[in-house]
């Protein structure tokens, strides 16, 4: 008779564990993951952090209304770009997300911005992580 409650508890724990392993990690969206070849792209301006100022100008015009500015980060509309979830991504992945957007998350595509300015924007996003 004592074995039944222990067995039921063990089965319940196993079921919870199995269900947890099937859930995607919080904060990730598998439908918005940069393809490997795009994620592997290197920022041609990575060795020129002074170009982040150009990215800041682009950010002020196109991104700050949702993502906030350097003093007032992330609004309720969009994630904090200085946060770990964004900063852990490769430059290529960030560039791909800027370029392609995500309509499911109300992130517009900024592929119309010239490529050099999008790479400068990636530099600026990186600088936001440095300020934490």
Locations of the language-model features?
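Positively charged n-region of N-terminal signal peptides that target proteins for export
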Residues: 1-4
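Bacterial N-terminal signal peptides
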Residues: 6-15
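Processing junctions and N-termini across compartments
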Residues: 14, 57-60, 101
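Sec/Tat signal peptide C-region and signal peptidase I cleavage site
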Residues: 16-20
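Axial heme c-ligation environment in periplasmic c-type cytochrome domains
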Residues: 21-27, 45, 74-82, 99-132
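Electrostatic cytochrome c docking/interface patches
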Residues: 24-58
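Gly/Gly-Pro-rich "capping" loops immediately C-terminal to redox-active cysteine motifs
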Residues: 45, 49, 54-56, 68-99
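The canonical Cys-X-X-Cys-His
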Residues: 55, 59-69, 121-125
């Amino acid at each position: 008779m004592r074995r039944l409650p222990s067995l039921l508890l063990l089965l319940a724990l196993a079921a919870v564990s199995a269900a947890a392993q099937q859930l995607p990690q919080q904060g990730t969206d598998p439908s918005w993951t940069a393809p490997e070849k795009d994620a592997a792209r290197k920022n041609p301006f990575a060795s020129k952090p002074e170009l982040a100022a150009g990215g800041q100008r682009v950010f002020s015009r196109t991104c700050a209304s949702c993502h906030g500015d350097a003093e007032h980060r992330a609004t309720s509309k969009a994630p904090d770009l200085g946060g770990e979830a964004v900063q852990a991504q490769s430059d290529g992945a960030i560039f791909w997300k800027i370029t392609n957007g995500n309509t499911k998350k109300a992130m517009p595509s900024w592929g119309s911005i010239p490529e050099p300015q999008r790479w400068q924007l990636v530099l600026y996003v990186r600088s936001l992580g440095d300020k934490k």
